[in-house]
Amino acid sequence: MSDYKSTLNLPETGFPMRGDLAKREPGMLARWTDDDLYGIIRAAKKGKKTFILHDGPPYANGSIHIGHSVNKILKDIIIKSKGLSGYDSPYVPGWDCHGLPIELKVEQEYGKPGEKFTAAEFRAKCREYAATQVDGQRKDFIRLGVLGDWSHPYLTMDFKTEANIIRALGKIIGNGHLHKGAKPVHWCVDCRSALAEAEVEYYDKTSPSIDVAFLAVDQDALKTKFGVSNVNGPISLVIWTTTPWTLPANRAISIAPDFDYALVQIDGQAVILAKDLVESVMQRIGVSDYTILGTVKGAELELLRFTHPFMDFDVPAILGDHVTLDAGTGAVHTAPGHGPDDYVIGQKYGLETANPVGPDGTYLPGTYPTLDGVNVFKANDIVIALLQEKGALLHVEKMQHSYPCCWRHKTPIIFRATPQWFVSMDQKGLRAQSLKEIKGVQWIPDWGQARIESMVANRPDWCISRQRTWGVPMSLFVHKDTEELHPRTLELMEEVAKRVEVDGIQAWWDLDAKEILGDEADQYVKVPDTLDVWFDSGSTHSSVVDVRPEFAGHAADMYLEGSDQHRGWFMSSLMISTAMKGKAPYRQVLTHGFTVDGQGRKMSKSIGNTVSPQDVMNKLGADILRLWVASTDYTGEMAVSDEILKRAADSYRRIRNTARFLLANLNGFDPAKDMVKPEEMVVLDRWAVGCAKAAQEDILKAYEAYDFHEVVQRLMRFCSVEMGSFYLDIIKDRQYTAKADSVARRSCQTALYHIAEALVRWMAPILSFTADEVWGYLPGEREKYVFTGEWYEGLFGLADSEAMNDAFWDELLKVRGEVNKVIEQARADKKVGGSLEAAVTLYAEPELAAKLTALGDELRFVLLTSGATVADYNDAPADAQQSEVLKGLKVALSKAEGEKCPRCWHYTQDVGKVAEHAEICGRCVSNVAGDGEKRKFA
């Protein structure tokens, strides 16, 4: 028997079947670094239109987790897809480097500043610690395949950035947005510092719920208001609170002007309550026998005075819009030093902003004899006992409610009035302008707009001062007596900024005021406060984007972070940019959900359901992690588990196998010499290129819309359905058996080449390592890296006017599917082994029959059978299988006649008819020793 294997064009490529990504990716990264791939991309894109995605800085503390990976991978996909879309899209990664978490880490190791180390030495230790954290996180981010200027990231602790943060504050002061006040702020007694809104988390807490009677000073005036004379016992206004410890700071009782308030007679006394809450209050305090003596509107009670239950003063009834009928009594205990609503109404009525609580959460001396020095959370029982003793306690019970806690310590926090610096939301119209700016931004998903609008509309003034050691100094001088800012504040801040730019923030603490104030130095003091770290990161649009040369003065097009950043970085950036420049710092804001496990549970070390990105990369490779991110709808929670990652790995194999098939069959193809013109190509090959063109249109649209899961789905459909189960199957016969240099084969290779050129680019933003690997095996002259180019523009398709247009082949796909069903059944029944052992007759109605007949003898190649004939639908025998998809089609199968050709494996009647090649069929003889077969359609 002759060996005809050597006459076949068998696929051959050095591109490995197995990805072995965990082993192979580090080598690629080393090459990218050695070549300065990021620099090559920047040079290639120079002068193009820009797209700037500004990196929200992760905090420089701890290893990266799966959420960090999601964030950086999404950014990288966008940057790379924008590059392929013709944009110059630089990526400058950043880190947030100041603040409490770093201080706490350094304290754990070295103690608090002033104990073993001076404050200056402590700051130096903080800077060292942050630098080591940046280095660790940077290695992991690079390992993810994220391309960026990793050698020159921005750090909020860079001297120049620290200086520019001071300048940003100066601009805000110059625009009139800063004010000082003793105002209640979120205060953590463990941190001994004010907290930003974004540093507050809510947990369930059990607190005492109490109803307290405030005795009326002028009993007769109240009787007159309610139009009654016969009242049994004293009259009180009743408040309800879950924070008894705040009662020493009570300075008023708030009621609603339009609510009806009832005077209710109970045993031995009368109480004033909101009429709509009388029944629920009576049930709560256990009173069944009561009488409503009269009602008045809340406005009638304004400025009537009531005796504080245990402090030696009385307080007014005041009118407030914050009073509701949701719970309580309709009268609200008001302590301006312990709550933002209380503070606002207190300002309106000129109330004292009393703050009897020290920074450590204990009452200050002189508050009340039994309370001085007591922790406020331990004081509730003392206050309740006092109320009981004074006869003012109507009811007490325990209740569980959501309570604000410190994000770092997870301990309850308090509202505490302290002298702080604020960015005002309203004194210069910052709130109104911010709300206007929000409308000009594209929010992705669109619900982000309503979310941040609500937050801006309702947020208090922003407390930007902190009493910390490791932070950017506010760099302010205030008068010793008046506490007013120095009249040359902006000029002085610029002088400080220049020094910080040279020596870092320590320059402020080393600064002797005389150096820049001269003779005035004795009249002014340096403000010791540092800036909220959210001010650091929130001002990077100014301190980084506006000054980095690669951004060339362009504002950021996009901010992209987790959905918690509406109240974090998106908010602080919007506030600062609007206060500085009157406009938003971004054009688009994209948010992604949090990662959860396969059961939808939050990631938790205690549950043991965390997924380490480092483990995934070491086991499966970064491309699998990237594919999981891209294939998950990031607009909601993003589920990840070993099983989910395994599915991503399965999808990866399908894409890799498709790429490998293309490369293996491009063996020996030189596009410069072997390319077939579109008009001379086999029709099916043109259809395949057209499929790629249609897929590319969908994929590019999805990239443009940031719908990456749609990119993956479309890519998978192209690889699995249009290519894998149809086109690539059909062309194997022609590719392997036709003459090597025949039009039939070169046409096929031309199609595969166009498809591969497109496919590798579709993959590149997501499967960056694999795309780089594929790129290295593609034939023809090309740039060194896929990332420097643009989307492939060599695709074309069939014209609708052609007889065998896309609709024709779509119908052939369905016919092929129906034939496959019949063949599978015949294989199950042991009638045939493989499809080439079968011959089929297609009984079709005239319109379909005409299409099938048009393919002539090439129909069998489309169906992967040794024989295929077309007959009239009405002539179908009883055992012909009716198609469920195509009503005008029945399929009958028989065993193919003739002998099996050992070269092409088709069964034909002409095997052995040519004496010189007695073992093979006539078609193979032509391909081996003759002019070669001609293919027109398939």
UniProtKB/Swiss-Prot annotation:
<dbReference type="GO" id="GO:0002161">
    <property type="term" value="F:aminoacyl-tRNA deacylase activity"/>
</dbReference>
<dbReference type="InterPro" id="IPR010663">
    <property type="entry name" value="Znf_FPG/IleRS"/>
</dbReference>
<dbReference type="Pfam" id="PF00133">
    <property type="entry name" value="tRNA-synt_1"/>
</dbReference>
<keyword id="KW-0963">Cytoplasm</keyword>
<keyword id="KW-0547">Nucleotide-binding</keyword>
<dbReference type="GO" id="GO:0006428">
    <property type="term" value="P:isoleucyl-tRNA aminoacylation"/>
</dbReference>
<keyword id="KW-0007">Acetylation</keyword>
<protein>
    <recommendedName>
        <fullName>Isoleucine--tRNA ligase</fullName>
        <ecNumber>6.1.1.5</ecNumber>
    </recommendedName>
</protein>
<comment type="similarity">
    <text>Belongs to the class-I aminoacyl-tRNA synthetase family. IleS type 1 subfamily.</text>
</comment>
<feature type="binding site">
    <location>
        <position position="924"/>
    </location>
    <ligand>
        <name>Zn(2+)</name>
    </ligand>
</feature>
<comment type="subunit">
    <text>Monomer.</text>
</comment>
<feature type="binding site">
    <location>
        <position position="605"/>
    </location>
    <ligand>
        <name>ATP</name>
    </ligand>
</feature>
<keyword id="KW-0648">Protein biosynthesis</keyword>
<keyword id="KW-0067">ATP-binding</keyword>
<dbReference type="InterPro" id="IPR001412">
    <property type="entry name" value="aa-tRNA-synth_I_CS"/>
</dbReference>
<dbReference type="InterPro" id="IPR002301">
    <property type="entry name" value="Ile-tRNA-ligase"/>
</dbReference>
<feature type="binding site">
    <location>
        <position position="904"/>
    </location>
    <ligand>
        <name>Zn(2+)</name>
    </ligand>
</feature>
<keyword id="KW-0862">Zinc</keyword>
<feature type="short sequence motif" description="'KMSKS' region">
    <location>
        <begin position="602"/>
        <end position="606"/>
    </location>
</feature>
<feature type="short sequence motif" description="'HIGH' region">
    <location>
        <begin position="58"/>
        <end position="68"/>
    </location>
</feature>
<feature type="modified residue" description="N6-acetyllysine">
    <location>
        <position position="183"/>
    </location>
</feature>
<keyword id="KW-0030">Aminoacyl-tRNA synthetase</keyword>
<keyword id="KW-0479">Metal-binding</keyword>
<dbReference type="GO" id="GO:0005524">
    <property type="term" value="F:ATP binding"/>
</dbReference>
<dbReference type="GO" id="GO:0008270">
    <property type="term" value="F:zinc ion binding"/>
</dbReference>
<feature type="binding site">
    <location>
        <position position="921"/>
    </location>
    <ligand>
        <name>Zn(2+)</name>
    </ligand>
</feature>
<dbReference type="InterPro" id="IPR002300">
    <property type="entry name" value="aa-tRNA-synth_Ia"/>
</dbReference>
<dbReference type="InterPro" id="IPR014729">
    <property type="entry name" value="Rossmann-like_a/b/a_fold"/>
</dbReference>
<dbReference type="InterPro" id="IPR023585">
    <property type="entry name" value="Ile-tRNA-ligase_type1"/>
</dbReference>
<feature type="binding site">
    <location>
        <position position="561"/>
    </location>
    <ligand>
        <name>L-isoleucyl-5'-AMP</name>
    </ligand>
</feature>
<dbReference type="InterPro" id="IPR009080">
    <property type="entry name" value="tRNAsynth_Ia_anticodon-bd"/>
</dbReference>
<dbReference type="GO" id="GO:0000049">
    <property type="term" value="F:tRNA binding"/>
</dbReference>
<dbReference type="GO" id="GO:0005829">
    <property type="term" value="C:cytosol"/>
</dbReference>
<dbReference type="Pfam" id="PF06827">
    <property type="entry name" value="zf-FPG_IleRS"/>
</dbReference>
<feature type="binding site">
    <location>
        <position position="901"/>
    </location>
    <ligand>
        <name>Zn(2+)</name>
    </ligand>
</feature>
<dbReference type="InterPro" id="IPR013155">
    <property type="entry name" value="M/V/L/I-tRNA-synth_anticd-bd"/>
</dbReference>
<keyword id="KW-0436">Ligase</keyword>
<comment type="function">
    <text>Catalyzes the attachment of isoleucine to tRNA(Ile). As IleRS can inadvertently accommodate and process structurally similar amino acids such as valine, to avoid such errors it has two additional distinct tRNA(Ile)-dependent editing activities. One activity is designated as 'pretransfer' editing and involves the hydrolysis of activated Val-AMP. The other activity is designated 'posttransfer' editing and involves deacylation of mischarged Val-tRNA(Ile).</text>
</comment>
<dbReference type="Pfam" id="PF08264">
    <property type="entry name" value="Anticodon_1"/>
</dbReference>
<dbReference type="GO" id="GO:0004822">
    <property type="term" value="F:isoleucine-tRNA ligase activity"/>
</dbReference>
<dbReference type="InterPro" id="IPR033708">
    <property type="entry name" value="Anticodon_Ile_BEm"/>
</dbReference>
<dbReference type="InterPro" id="IPR050081">
    <property type="entry name" value="Ile-tRNA_ligase"/>
</dbReference>
